[in-house]
Amino acid sequence: MVAMIRDGVRSQARRDMTDEVAHRYQALLAGRDATAEDWLETQLRRVRDREDDLPEDPNLLPQWAENHAAQVAHDHAHYLRQRREGAPRRYFATRAQALWFLQQVAPTKAVDGAWLHGTLRHWRDPRYHGLIRTFLEELGDGDPRCNHVLIYQRLLSRLGCLQGLPLEPSRFVQGAVQLALGQHCERFLPEVIGYNLGYEQPPLHLLITTHELAELGIDAHYFQLHVTIDNAASGHARRSLESLRMLAPVDDEDFYGRVRHGYRLNDLGLDTPSLIASFDLQGELLAALERKRVFGQFMHSDRCRLQGRTINQWLAKSGAMAGFLEALQVQGWIKRDSDPTQSRFWSLIDGPGAAMFGVFSAYEKQLWHDWIAGSWQGAGPRRVSPGQWEQALALQAEAPGRAQASEIATLIEAMAGNRHAEPAGLRATRDYIAATGLFQGGPR
């Protein structure tokens, strides 16, 4: 009994800790977390004794990065060969799974680049220019067509997923880490450099995700952009090495040790392949119905009955949705493992003339579609090349900014969190670039 109580206390403590990180994320996003430094120290203690794949000698980092890029390229070629030989998609069995994943990682994507925000005040020091340029490129240099956060928001909006799902608190860990690092760069500069080093090395899952989203009719421009801009030859991955070389004191083992701790922060939370694999189609459909159930009670005529119970009675009790799905099948409203359009229930929820038009979101309808379809394989969605949706947008480049050096502190504040994706933040980014002279040159 004592052991059971102890386990219960520990379990509750873990729940409290994860609940806390979701609130912390929101506080950091608003710039109001007075205990972020202490929290970040706690996260660093969590990873301090973990293993990593960095070389003991920082002089070997260029070779390490080259080896990493070569391994990713090799593994991606192997993946493509498997697909050509008929292997199924590795990550996304259904489109619903892809939509679920995009919503699960939204808290991190909403603060893309935030860990580098604190470098902006060092614009007079050329050693910081690599980190600053990386941050500005994450912000699209203030161009709404190129701002990474806006690109992701547009993707979610196009897919009907902007409202978002109730998320496990652990989904906020990486976003909170990034925001905390960005707000406390002065104290945690080595850790910022290390985190940046790890985050900017293009992983295999990025390439596979880009490939499979396109197959499922989803514009993977956001992911393709990170494949190209983070490249190890001349992109953010290469720049992360140069920034470390320029900012690290000579032969300072403690500094490099802290860099490695920052690098390990990337491993907090669930890794991408494991997150994707945790998707449960029926579980997500049941969860969606349970959320809807509360609002659907007493909204149906008592003439609507399934296995002797009215729809209102089915919706009145928590935990009854699995039985509800079974009843829909038994009475012929749903034909599993078949074209969803052959199910009478589908005609109730899909199309402008449907009796339940608008009841289910685009994501929820995709859950229904893929659950009904089951093993049935239709033609599938038309492939969307990365950037196809973005190219069709009526967005234009904004005018170059104008600002004085005396205004830079105000501009930096307007670029914090994800405020840089708002019109005022986009303008502040352009003004910051104009005031500091940190333009990115191009061909003439």
Locations of regions flagged by a protein language model:
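Non-heme di-metal
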Residues: M1-R444
